[in-house]
Amino acid sequence: MEYYIRETLITDFQDVKTLKNKRKCFSFFFELRLFSPQCLFIVYFFYLLHVRINTSPLFIKTTTRPTALIHITKYSEALASRLLKGHMTQLSLRTILPPAHTKNLHRQQPTTWLDS
């Protein structure tokens, strides 16, 4: 089961509640254009979800284009209800991508296109 969010469909992430299967698991693929502040908000939102609940791996990859792919798997129905209750704070590169993630990214360092 795959779900795509682009910056023009930012409000559609509330449809996460409908993405349940019989095992009540989720598999999301979010493709985000990180030049958009709204998309940075979504990246930070799912990063906070991963850190605070810590139930599933979070993979962030970069390509030669300014795009990030986030893969989040195995979320229960109860977790989906928490998905919409996050509290956002200021965005920064270090809160979105901690050192454990940044050192394993593609050759291009995210600072070249996130810090502008």
UniProtKB/Swiss-Prot annotation:
One of its GO terms (cellular component) is mitochondrion. It comes from the Eukaryota. This is Uncharacterized protein C29E6.07. It comes from Schizosaccharomyces pombe (strain 972 / ATCC 24843).
